Amino acid sequence: MGNRKAKPYNFGAVIVKNDEIIGEDFNHVHEEQDPTLHAETSAIKKACKNYGSHNLDGATMYGSHEPCLMCFSCAAWAGIDRIVYAVAASEQKFSYEFTDVSLQDLARKLTWRTISVEHIPLEVA
């Protein structure tokens, strides 16, 4: 995801489809004063533009941190099939746990699509 100076909210995300990076970005919430510009939503937006479609079926989203519900929903609407993240929400300095439902539970409850959610800690990655 390239080099970037550390900032308090330094989140990154990469979208991969057919073994090719089609979108990547960082969190822009504070610099743009826009609460929707999380790394995941920004990377999905770039991936859709680069891929030429709003449908990213078969893509994987890799994130530095566990996606929030907004980002999970955006991934679902974009057709992303797999989400992999390194740092769980409960491990973050700036926790944003808005619900007691895990992403894995939420993914299992979806009736209109299947999304695999994997936590691969940094020590393992």
Q: PLM features: residue spans?
A:
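Zinc-dependent deaminase
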Residues: 1-6, 67, 73-125
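Residue-level recognition of the N-termini of beta-strands and the immediately preceding loop/turn
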Residues: 9-11, 57-59, 115
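Short beta-strand scaffold segments in enzyme catalytic cores
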Residues: 10-19
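Short beta->alpha transition motifs characteristic of CBS
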Residues: 22-29, 88
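Conserved Nudix-box catalytic region and its N-terminal flanking loop in Nudix hydrolases
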Residues: 31-34
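Short HxH-centered metal-ligating active-site micro-motif
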Residues: 36, 41-70
